[in-house]
UniProtKB/Swiss-Prot annotation:
Keywords: Porphyrin biosynthesis, Transferase. It catalyses: 4 porphobilinogen + H2O = hydroxymethylbilane + 4 NH4(+). The porphobilinogen subunits are added to the dipyrromethane group. The keyword Cell membrane does not apply. Binds 1 dipyrromethane group covalently. This is Porphobilinogen deaminase. It is an enzyme of class 2 (transferase).
Amino acid sequence: MKRKIIVGSRRSKLALTQSNWVINKLKENYPAFDFEIKEIVTKGDRILDVTLSKVGGKGLFVSEVEQALSDKTIDFAVHSMKDVPSSLKEGLVIGAIPKRESPLDCFVFNQVNALDELPHGSVIGTSSLRRAAQLLKHRPDFVIKPIRGNIDTRLQKLHAENFDAIILAKAGLARMGWLENTTLKLEDIPPELCLPAVGQGALAIECRESDQQIRDMLTSIHHEETGICVEAERVFLKKLNGGCEIPIAGFATKANEAVHFKGLVGNADGSIILEAEQTGANPSEIGNKVAEDLLSKGADTIIQELRNI
């Protein structure tokens, strides 16, 4: 009797789109298997009236899903990598990281068509301290206003709540098929202006360490280059013990055999932004070295001050 594979997913449109994309990829390689999605509501989905940095803790969008894995009510889970804490629940592993979508953030404008057209004092919607800090460094005149909800909810709020612009991950728009939407006024934010979050644009497929059949299956959709880059980023995040309450960014690229990684830590208003970068062959070493460079520049002081607020 063939095994039915139960896939854990948050119930947002984006999460379900991502989970179905993974299932369709696996069906190409394993047509004999049946797949079924089990929708799971997480703490981050339930708490919508405060920013994630104020909720605190790690794994706000994954803890309940990981519990379902441990309880064996699902066989694997599909996460946005940037939501996955640097340390997984015991007994769980990341079984595959498919090829990364765009890692960039992007502006979605209300009236104008470009960042340079936004007037003094424009109201920008983002609940990400990472985005806010880097944007305020570039444009301290901006007023940052928190915005929560799924990607479609935030797009509705752009007009309903009179934001001049909101910031979204480009990967989410791409996976929803909305980059081709001619009614959206979009502009990519280059990493020089806003370095992406660790793992941004990548998916994490998490499973039980002991489930060899699922692990073998997931290997078929793993993308080696993405995995190497994300490894550097996540080692960096773990070294700094980062979470959503700290403006931390990290982005790696690979060319030939070399990994280039840039990391950043800042304070909430962008008045202090510390940066470091390294290039080398070993992604773990590179991630660690960049974290150590930032700690030597005073990142630990910034992190501690933000945690004590």
